[in-house]
Amino acid sequence: MKVKASVGKRCEYCKVIRRRGKVYVVCKVNPKHNQRQG
């Protein structure tokens, strides 16, 4: 999970999710794409 100021989809399988006021990008196909906005 990378913590970045600016998050976004990196492939077609990434999903943008909001949890507890934070923005996450979750990707099951390529876990390297997992990000959290911080």
Swiss-Prot record:
InterPro entries associated with the record: Ribosomal_bL36, Ribosomal_bL36_sp
Keyword tags: Ribonucleoprotein, Ribosomal protein
Key word Ribosomal protein present: yes
Listed GO MF terms: structural constituent of ribosome
GO biological process, one term: translation
A Pfam family per the record: Ribosomal_L36
Spans traversing the lipid bilayer: none
GO CC annotations on file: cytoplasm; ribonucleoprotein complex; ribosome
Taxonomy, superkingdom: Bacteria
SUPFAM superfamilies: Ribosomal protein L36
Family label: Belongs to the bacterial ribosomal protein bL36 family.
Name of the molecule in the record: Large ribosomal subunit protein bL36
Organism: Fervidobacterium nodosum (strain ATCC 35602 / DSM 5306 / Rt17-B1)
Gene from which this protein is expressed: rpmJ
